[in-house]
Amino acid sequence: GGCIKWNHSCQTTTLKCCGKCVVCYCHTPWGTNCRCDRTRLFCTED
């Protein structure tokens, strides 16, 4: 269980980011420096 908090580092294969709309975003083309710091477009927290 558990989830990764906003702006904490993440890997797309492990725990999900906290919040339904929050996604793990990698800041380099080769898939490193990934953080839970993006939200899905047109997504609302329910």
Swiss-Prot record:
Species whose genome carries this gene: Macrothele gigas (Japanese funnel web spider)
Tissue specificity statement from the Swiss-Prot or TrEMBL entry: Expressed by the venom gland.
Note: Shows very weak inhibition on rat Nav1.4/SCN4A sodium channels (23% at 50 uM of toxin and 35% at 100 uM).
Role description: Competes for binding at site 3 of the insect voltage-gated sodium channel (Nav). Insecticidal neurotoxin. Causes temporary paralysis to lepidopteran larvae (10.3 nmol/g) or to crickets (doses from 0.93 to 119 ug/g). Is not toxic to mice when injected intracranially (high doses).
Example of a GO cellular component annotation carried by this entry: extracellular region
The UniProt record lists the keyword Secreted: yes
Family: Belongs to the neurotoxin 02 (plectoxin) family. 02 (plectoxin) subfamily.
Record's comment describing the protein's domains: The presence of a 'disulfide through disulfide knot' structurally defines this protein as a knottin.
Keywords, alphabetical: Disulfide bond, Ion channel impairing toxin, Knottin, Neurotoxin, Secreted, Toxin, Voltage-gated sodium channel impairing toxin
Protein name, UniProt field: Mu-hexatoxin-Mg2a
GO MF term set: sodium channel regulator activity; toxin activity
Chief subcellular location: secreted
Compartments where found: Secreted
Disulphide linkage map: C3-C18, C10-C24, C17-C36, C21-C43, C26-C34
Presence of keyword Disulfide bond: yes
Superkingdom assignment: Eukaryota
